[in-house]
Amino acid sequence: TPEAGVHENYKRAVLEAASMGIPIVDGEVALRCNLISLEGDDDDPRIKNHSSGHITTEEARELIAAVDQELGGGRGERPARFHAGISYRHLTVLPGGWASPAVDCSPPHDNVGGRIADLLPVARVDAEPAAAATAARLRDLIARSRPLLAAHPVNAARRAAGQDTADSLWFWSPGRRPSMPTLHERFGITGAVISAVDLIRGLGVYAGLDVIRVEGATGL
């Protein structure tokens, strides 16, 4: 299900990238990348939760580093880069101009209990040809992430402790860098934003506001 009520040029991922200090250049596509927990049959799993049991930031950083080393790093014909965020909330950038944001992705928090097979990224009807390649690449990354994450020591420790594990990557909110005037350019005003949420801070960045960061704030 595409995000409802969100303008095509202002998708969550590119706004979060601005907050995280990750530059998105023209032609690149950014996506939110969740670490999610699965349940049920390995051949036909369902989403157990969208947050890997609210995995810690320290654990998640280890996992995303491993994912970028094995599956990303900006290498290959259809490159991807993975950037660690907070807890289960991370970012993927598809550089090189090959990708399209015209892909329907399902937000995991809206689809807890849903079958993975019914929710995988697909190109939009009548989308540009690059959309099909983008959707296929995202599906491939999801599939390849599962054995990699399953074998990681972080998940072994969580499994032994009876905690939900980070079983898969999950992509949503694809978009390109927006073009928007700052509040000063449009109205001649300045201001600041205080938030623990990257989405809100990213809006502040694009609006030209001072972003005030509070140490230890996570938004959880």
Model-assigned labels for residue ranges:
Residues T1-G73:
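Active-site nucleophile/metal-coordination loop of metallo-enzymes that catalyze phosphate/sulfate
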Residues E3-N9, R89-L94, S179-M180:
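Short, solvent-exposed polar/charged micro-motifs at secondary-structure junctions
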Residues V14-S19, R115, P121-R124, S179-T182, ...:
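Short, solvent-exposed coil/turn linker segments
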Residues G27-A30, A84-I86, Q163, V197:
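A short, structural micro-pattern
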Residues R32-N34, R89, I200:
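Short glycine-rich loop/turn motifs
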Residues L38-D42, P95-G97, P174:
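Generic structural motif
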Residues K48-D167, F171:
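Internal, non-catalytic "lid/hinge" segments that mediate substrate recognition, gating
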Residues G96, D126-R137, A143, V154-L220:
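Terminal, contiguous helix-loop blocks that mediate binding/assembly
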